[in-house]
Structure formats: C-alpha cells, structure tokens
C-alpha cells in the first residue's frame, strides 16, 4: 500500500477545479481515491449546508470519471467536511489515494476506511452508535494493515446530528432522543463516535460506558479520535490513519496533544512525532509537513492560562468558532500554511480543555 496526499485550494464549496486539474494531468487517478477531508466556509452548525453542497459537487465530478452514479461515489468514498473557516483558516480539501507498493522496510503512512449503517434519530448519541462505530473502527484498522493500536495516530469520524426533520420524525413515532435541540445534539453525536474509537482501540472499557456517560463523563476519552457531526449524513464515515510496516511510500503520520488553543509547543511536538525525531522542538522541520488535522476547544471555564476569555459567554459567536479561529492562527504561525483541518468540539477527545492534533509529513 502507498498512500498519496493531495491538498487543494477551493474558491467556494462547489469548486472542484483543482481536483479536476490533477486528474487531467495524470497526478491523481480517480479509481485510487479512497477518502477526502476538507474545510468549507459555512458556520459549522446544524444549518450549515456548505458541507452537503461540497460532497455533491465532488461526487458529481468523480461520477463522470468512474462511470458510476454520484450516490455510488458517496457509498465508496467518505467525504468528511468540517464547516467553519474562521480567522486565517482557508477552505480546502485533502484527497487521499491508495495504490499498490512494496513495503520500504520502515513503517509508512497507511489508511483504512469503513462506513457504518444508517442511524435512526433515537440512536444518535447513544451506546448503539458507540458500538457501531467501534465495530467500524476495527474494520478500518484491519483495512489499514496495521498490527498494533499504538501505531494508530488519527481516526477521523463524521456522523449525523439531529436535524429538525429528524427531531420531527422521532416525535411522530414517539421515539426518545438525547435532545430535541439540533445544535445541542452535536456534543452527544461527537461524544458517542469518539467513545466508539476509544473502545475499538482499547483506550476505554466498553463495560464502563452507558448512555448516561456520553457527553457527561469526560474522564473517558480517546487521544486519537477527531469527530464531527453534520446534518448531511445519516451514517458514520471512518477514516483511520497510522503507520504500517506493510505500507510503502515516503509519508508518515504522528500525533500529539494540545494543552490549549495556543499551545505552539504542542504543534511542534506533533510534527516531531511524525518525523520520528526527538530534536529540540524549536528546530522542527516544518517544510516536511503535508497536512495537519486538529480539534479546537474553549478553555475549561473560559479561563486561558489564568486570564478570562469570552469564548463561553459570547452570545453572538459560538465557542467552537472562537476556538477554531484561535487554533488556526497558532498552527499557521508554525507551518505557514492556513489550509488546516481544524474542527471544533472535543467531547471525549482528550482530557477536558485539551485537544488532539495529527500531522502527516514527507520523509
């Protein structure tokens, strides 16, 4: 296996011209595309339709090349979009390809894909979703040809939140939901999928979990999960990244933990982890960085390093947007590239106030 990473600019959520150019130039083969992760310029909330628009645009393009329907494209390729390009964050997409290659003798970047069944509204944010995601993560782990959970550095999950239509459907059927607030369902949805990752990788014992734990007991978490929820999906899409001795190529992945949204040293440490170096963090070679994926979170109680912030009390701007803008600037100050995947909300993704970060580098 050889994984290719192609990061492209987007002028709007429907702009597929860069991918089309790569395909026409022979730099990307459509039948080798296995996943896409990107940022769109929506608000990231329950009424963010830029994500669905972007998926529709890319699936229409690829349908023409692959000779299948757009619907078949989305069943074959996970399209994971995070809405919200606040501050310096730039709308973009990272396309992942997978092809045959001889192992190098060293562990190299590997990718595994899995997609769950569709969920009923009453299953979102519950143990049912936890278990289904855990099973899918195990399948993605196998697909990535990784032998040890310690070699997994990043598990991206995108799943459904409760849209107004889903809430109404459950109401007609008398089904109980975790909440009837569409935006309020995001913590439950993100939390359940993150716990699914934690269970699959042995970070949390499933026997300790219950519906009452989700989005409440934050002492249960995964250190490598990066989960998002949107109204454009009814199932969960899992993209698992790690390093495998059965993979070829010249890419590696590493990860780290950001202590807060201004943790520059944490960014550098994640880059160093990917490079496999123990050098002084100030000497990290950022020119090797191919892609960065991180979560952003407001500080616990709104207090950042002893100083009060308004992230959690601002009635006009959601805290996730504050956090994405802050972390986007911090990471860009290190790498020099604002095309970063930064997603808000870290329920069961590292300890409260902390956040995961993963980096792919060329070696």
Task: Name these PLM-found stretches.
Residues 1-363:
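Terminal domain-initiation and capping elements
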């Amino acid at each position: 296996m050889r994984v290719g990473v192609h990061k492209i600019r987007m002028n709007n959520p429907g702009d597929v011209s860069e991918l089309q150019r790569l395909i026409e130039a022979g730099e990307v083969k459509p039948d080798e595309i296995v996943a896409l992760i990107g940022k769109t310029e929506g608000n990231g909330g329950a009424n963010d339709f830029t994500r669905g628009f972007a998926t529709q645009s890319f699936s229409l393009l690829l349908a023409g090349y692959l000779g299948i329907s757009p619907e078949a494209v989305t069943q074959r390729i996970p399209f994971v979009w995070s809405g919200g390009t606040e501050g310096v964050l730039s709308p973009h997409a990272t396309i992942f390809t997978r092809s045959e290659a001889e192992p190098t003798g060293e562990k190299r970047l590997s990718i595994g894909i899995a997609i769950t069944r569709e969920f009923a509204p009453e299953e979102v944010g519950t143990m049912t979703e936890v278990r289904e995601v855990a099973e899918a993560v195990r399948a993605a782990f196998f697909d990535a040809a990784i032998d040890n959970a310690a070699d997994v550095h990043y598990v991206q999950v995108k799943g459904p939140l409760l849209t107004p239509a889903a809430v109404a459907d459950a109401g007609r059927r008398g089904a109980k939901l975790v909440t009837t607030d569409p935006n309020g369902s995001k913590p439950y949805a993100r939390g359940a999928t993150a716990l699914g990752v934690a269970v699959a990788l042995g970070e949390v014992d499933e026997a300790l979990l219950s519906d009452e734990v989700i989005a409440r007991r934050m002492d249960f978490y995964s250190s490598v999960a990066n989960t998002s929820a949107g109204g454009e999906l009814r199932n969960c899409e899992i993209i698992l990244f790690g390093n495998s001795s059965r993979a070829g190529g010249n890419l590696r992945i590493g990860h780290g933990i950001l202590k807060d949204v201004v943790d520059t040293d944490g960014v550098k440490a994640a880059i160093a982890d990917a490079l496999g170096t123990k050098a002084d963090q100030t000497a990290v070679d950022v020119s090797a960085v191919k892609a960065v994926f991180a979560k952003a979170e407001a500080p616990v109680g709104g207090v950042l390093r002893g100083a009060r912030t308004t992230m959690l009390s601002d009635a006009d701007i959601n805290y996730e947007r504050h956090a994405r803008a802050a972390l986007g600037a911090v990471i860009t100050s290190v790498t020099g590239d604002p095309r970063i995947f930064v997603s808000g909300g870290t329920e069961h993704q590292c300890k409260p106030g902390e956040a995961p970060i993963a980096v792919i580098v060329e070696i």
